[in-house]
């Protein structure tokens, strides 16, 4: 009986020793782990970038401009929420439906746009960074508000548009409170054309749009930004 107890004890000690050894191989000491916790708190981000994309089939939509803005982010574990305000210095062409096809297009002229959005992001590394980096995917909903535009005899105005944008990005934390990030998104909005674009011009009798064409058109706009954030 004593022999059996001693044998069982030796087996148990061997199992425990093997388990501890395996655990030591799989895990990391905190000081040497590639994973580190992200500091909790709101993050104020200053962003700069460039927004391009399609001007639509007619060519009157705003595009090709530098952007600058601010964003406030709040993390909720692996998911984060954000609010953004951005000014875009864009430009657009003017198409005069009352001129012939060779002279009806002019520009480009400045057409500023303000973008407001709210979004959600999923942090792929959870509440931690991997070697200081935290990639994410997400999406934002918002509005784009057109500013003063050049005189347009067709009556076309960019106006206020609903926007949607999927996005991906990468955050780098060189310090506990400081972060640098790059973000790429594809902004979608819908242009609305005036009915004058379907009227034949008085010179060569050619309309801007065919009579069967739609007066609305979705356009896509790649938007790349870099930003610097501070966690409060």
What are these regions (language model features)?
Residues 61-65, 97-103, 153-158, 197-206:
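Flexible, surface-exposed loop regions and adjacent strand-edge segments
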Residues 71-155, 159-162, 174, 221-232:
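Gram-negative (and chloroplast) outer-membrane scaffold detector with strong preference
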Residues 44-50, 83-89, 137-145, 170, ...:
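Transmembrane beta-barrel strands of outer-membrane/channel proteins
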Residues 1-38:
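Cleavable N-terminal export/targeting peptides
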Residues 175-232:
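Predominantly the C-terminal beta-signal and adjacent terminal strand-loop region
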Residues 57-60, 155, 212-213:
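A short acidic/glycine-rich loop-to-helix N-cap element
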Residues 24-77, 87, 148, 208, ...:
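Short glycine/proline- and aromatic-enriched beta-strand/turn motifs that initiate or cap beta-hairpins
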């Amino acid at each position: 009986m004593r022999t059996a107890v001693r044998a069982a004890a030796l087996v148990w000690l061997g199992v425990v020793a093997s388990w501890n050894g395996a655990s030591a191989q799989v895990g990391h000491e905190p000081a040497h782990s590639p994973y580190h916790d992200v500091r909790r708190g709101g993050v104020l981000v200053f962003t700069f970038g460039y927004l391009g994309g399609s001007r639509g089939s007619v060519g009157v939509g705003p595009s090709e401009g530098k952007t600058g803005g601010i964003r406030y982010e709040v993390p909720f574990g692996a998911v984060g929420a954000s609010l953004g305000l951005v000014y875009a210095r864009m430009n657009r062409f003017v198409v005069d439906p009352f001129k012939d096809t060779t002279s009806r297009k002019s520009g480009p002229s400045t057409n500023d746009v303000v973008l407001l959005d709210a979004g959600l992001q999923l942090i792929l590394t959870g509440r931690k960074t991997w070697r200081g980096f935290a990639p994410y995917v997400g999406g934002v909903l918002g509005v784009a508000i057109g500013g003063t535009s050049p005189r347009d005899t067709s009556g076309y105005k960019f106006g206020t548009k609903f926007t949607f944008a999927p996005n991906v990005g990468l955050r780098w934390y060189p310090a506990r409170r400081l972060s640098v990030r790059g973000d790429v998104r594809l902004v979608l909005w819908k242009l609305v054309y005036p009915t004058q674009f379907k009227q034949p011009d008085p010179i060569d009798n050619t309309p801007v749009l065919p009579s069967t064409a739609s007066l609305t058109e979705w356009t896509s706009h790649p938007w790349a930004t870099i930003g610097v954030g501070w966690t409060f």
